Regions:
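Non-catalytic surface loops within mature trypsin-like serine protease
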Residues: 19-21, 113-117
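Beta-strand/loop-dominated core regions that host nucleotide or nucleotide-derived cofactor-binding catalytic loops
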Residues: 126
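Extended, charged alpha-helical "arm"/coiled-coil substrate-binding scaffolds
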Residues: 2-67, 129-340
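Generic hydrophobic, aliphatic-rich segments that mediate packing or membrane embedding
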Residues: 50, 54, 67, 71-75, ...
Length: 340
């Protein structure tokens, strides 16, 4: 067997594996023998069909399985032995020659590999990101006051029709509620904006290049039957932005030796469950009910993965906020909403 590596650039490799008959012959023989033991052909006792008949019916299948087994082992070994940090899985190359599945042949397989980029940057106090304090504009406050008045009018009208108690609100009460709601709303939005700006800042600072053509092909193969090339093109920029942040986040987790433990996952799952119940108006549920739901969430690996990513985000953001300069910046709510 011969394995040769062709470096296209820092992010792309072409791997050629030449499998000779001697590499797969013994594996093929064992697979044919196994088929023979289990074969049940009319006119022959089980396991007693002649080898020629077994080869006629199962020969190509056993050949393909044997070659693929050898090929897979060689591919995995080369990646491990050469410490290749590959993205996703190797893809059959567009330069792959046609394979003629004939017993005794030598076979050539060509693979494209996408490689993770090297990431290296420092986090210093000279890294500056604006931290917004939002002043609510008169226009936004007037809109909120108008919406609240309509809300209470409709609520009291419904209460009157049902002979229920009304909730009387003075103009002063509504003005106060509007101010409180807007303050809370823009505080949350400013916190979200700060995290977004920090994320974008360090993704740009890292200057990460990716094997984009490979990634498009890999996404199509990995999601075969679920997405089209057009779907991938449409969402590709968003995918790249998220992927780059994942790489930056992973680099910073390692740089600062940040870890996620079971307690982190449990607390995050509990917060997630509590929020989900609150969305349906179910607050102040018994602790036992919350914990039962948490246990179920943590049994779902996809949920655990999402929760772990959120915990990583939180840990990395907290650390970055300590290490960089957050520049206090006052802004009106109208201008804040216009930020890109």
């Amino acid at each position: 067997m011969k394995v040769s590596q062709n470096k296209i650039d820092d992010l792309n490799l072409e791997l050629t594996i030449e499998v000779e008959a001697a590499d797969y012959a013994e594996i093929e023989r064992k697979k044919l023998a196994e088929r023979k033991r289990n074969a049940d052909f009319k006119g022959f006792r089980k396991g007693m069909a002649p080898a020629s008949l077994i080869k006629k019916f199962f020969g190509e299948q056993c050949l393909v399985e044997a070659v693929n087994q050898v090929l897979s082992q060689a591919l995995d070994a080369h990646i491990k032995d050469n410490s290749l940090r590959i993205i996703g899985e190797p893809l059959s190359s567009e330069n792959q020659p046609e394979v003629e599945w004939t017993d005794g042949n030598n076979f050539t397989f060509v693979f494209d590999l996408g490689l993770y980029p090297e990431i290296n940057f420092d986090v210093v106090k000279d890294d500056k990101v604006p931290s917004y304090t939002v002043t609510v504009s008169a226009k936004d406050k007037a809109t909120m006051v108008e919406n609240l008045k309509k809300y209470y009018e409709e609520k009291n009208k419904s209460a009157e029709e049902q002979s229920a108690a009304k909730e009387e609100k003075s103009d002063e009460d509504i003005e106060k509620e509007a101010a409180e709601r807007l303050e809370a709303q823009f505080k949350n939005e400013a916190e979200w904006r700060l995290s977004k700006d920090i994320r974008d800042y360090f993704v740009n600072k890292a200057g990460i290049s990716l094997p984009e053509a490979f990634l498009k092909r890999w996404l199509l193969v990995a999601n075969q039957g679920k997405v089209t090339k057009e779907d991938i093109e449409k969402e590709f920029d968003a995918f790249l932005a998220d992927f780059r942040w994942q790489l930056v986040r992973g680099y910073l987790m390692k740089k600062y030796n940040l870890k996620i433990d079971e307690k982190d996952l449990h607390e995050a799952a509990e917060a997630f469950v509590t929020y989900q119940y609150a969305m349906y108006g179910l607050g102040n549920l018994p602790k036992e009910m919350i914990q039962e739901a948490v246990v179920n969430v943590l049994k779902n690996q996809e949920q655990v993965q999402r929760i772990a990513e959120n915990v990583e985000d939180s840990k990395v953001m907290s650390k970055l906020k300590e290490e960089i300069t957050l520049e206090p910046t006052k802004i009106t709510s109208l201008k804040f909403k216009d930020l890109k």
